[in-house]
Design a protein with these regions (language model features):
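Short loop/turn and low-complexity linker motifs enriched in small/turn-promoting residues
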Residues: 29-148
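Bacterial N-terminal signal peptides that target proteins for export
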Residues: 7-17
């Protein structure tokens, strides 16, 4: 009957939309970061370098994590990517989803003080029942080196 044909068409269209929505969430994207961990600077020249790494993982792997320091974007990290940034004075870091696939993903932020030391941050994804958000946590140098 006509009703069955209409119902089949609706199901086909919804399957297509569901697949279209899931592909960016489940696939792994490359960002602007490096897959190679940066060399950690040990010279105490008064500069503060902040080091970021994005955890590996399946959930949210297709969504790039946009990193902003003091309102300026410094990179978009895919899973297992790294980026560094030099700062002076107090700084504020904000992590959010990049692009259309990042729309609706929760954000996280953290603050720090540039005091001539290196600081290390791990970016992750926390999944709730009906939501997902990026997280940022400060770690030690050894925690950073062991991440992934």
């Amino acid at each position: 009957s006509k009703r069955k044909i209409m119902l089949k068409n609706v199901i086909k269209k919804n399957k297509f939309l569901l697949i279209l929505f899931l592909i960016p969430l489940l696939s792994s994207c490359s960002g602007t970061g490096s897959k190679i961990k940066p060399t950690i600077s040990t010279t105490n020249n008064g500069n503060t370098t902040i080091y970021f790494t994005r955890e590996g993982g399946f959930v949210g792997g297709g969504i790039l994590a946009k990193i902003e320091v003091d309102g300026t974007e410094i990179g978009k990290l895919g899973t297992k990517e790294h980026v560094t940034h030099n700062v002076s004075g107090n700084y504020r870091i904000k992590i959010s989803g990049a692009g259309i696939s990042g729309f609706g993903i929760g954000t996280d932020s953290i603050s720090g003080v540039a005091d001539g030391k290196n600081y290390f941050y791990i970016i992750g994804v926390k999944q709730g029942l009906f939501s997902m958000k990026f997280t940022i946590n400060e770690t030690t140098e050894s925690g950073y080196k062991q991440s992934h």
